[in-house]
From Swiss-Prot:
Recorded family membership: Belongs to the purine/pyrimidine phosphoribosyltransferase family. PyrR subfamily.
EC number: 2.4.2.9
Name the UniProt record assigns to this protein: Bifunctional protein PyrR
Lineage start: Bacteria, Bacillati, Bacillota, Bacilli, Lactobacillales
One function term, GO molecular function aspect: uracil phosphoribosyltransferase activity
Top enzyme class: transferase
Gene Ontology biological process terms, A to Z: DNA-templated transcription termination
Motif extent (PRPP-binding): 99-111
Biological source species: Ligilactobacillus salivarius (strain UCC118) (Lactobacillus salivarius)
Subunit structure: Homodimer and homohexamer; in equilibrium.
Keyword Metal-binding attributed: no
Keyword hit for Transcription regulation: yes
Length: 178
């Protein structure tokens, strides 16, 4: 059975707070770009960009990052098929930019490690910060988020499910027992 952690309004408030934190920490939005990790990170990045536009009256580029080829588990025998790989083109140059990498859930850190590898293959940004909607702990790598919507301590037999309207038809965060 799933336990609701955030409804759509709480999720919106968390993203708004994260947006303010991004502005404050960076003293504005100069040279800022957002890169969402597919799939849900892309939609969260776009929502942050929309809020930045409302607050700062300026567009911030948003790109999407497919980390499929960079995952350290892609050769796992339990994966039934070869990965589908999309072009690694963000649509803008990240050289000397301040990149905010956006994802839905931070767990072991392996997805973020893969995303950092992918970003470095694309270009050399001036700085990279990490924004996640949920930090659930249980890190296997020394990775920490700079902007967090909600810290949710979890057990290993639990799963955090983030829903975004663009993919799932609703917004929210649930905690599920496996």
């Amino acid at each position: 059975m799933a336990k609701q952690i955030y409804d759509s309004m709480a999720m919106k408030r968390a993203l708004t707070r994260m947006t303010y934190e991004i502005i404050e920490k960076n003293k504005g939005i100069d040279d800022l770009v957002l890169v969402g990790i597919k799939t849900r990170g892309v939609y969260l990045a776009q929502r942050i960009a929309d809020r930045l536009k409302q607050l700062e009256n300026a567009e911030v580029p948003v790109g999407q990052l497919d980390i499929t080829l960079y995952r350290d588990d892609r050769h796992d025998a339990s994966l039934a098929q070869d990965p589908v790989v999309n072009e690694a083109d963000l649509g803008f140059d990240i050289k000397d930019k301040h990149v905010i990498l956006v994802d839905d859930v931070l767990f072991t850190g392996r997805t973020i490690r893969a995303a950092l590898d992918a970003l470095m293959d694309i270009g050399r940004p001036k700085k990279i910060n990490l924004a996640v909607l949920v930090d659930r702990g249980h890190r296997e790598l020394p990775i920490r988020a700079d902007f967090v919507g909600k810290n949710i301590p979890t057990a290993m037999d639990e799963q955090v499910a983030v829903y975004v309207d663009e993919v799932d038809g609703k917004d929210g965060i649930e905690l599920k027992k496996l």
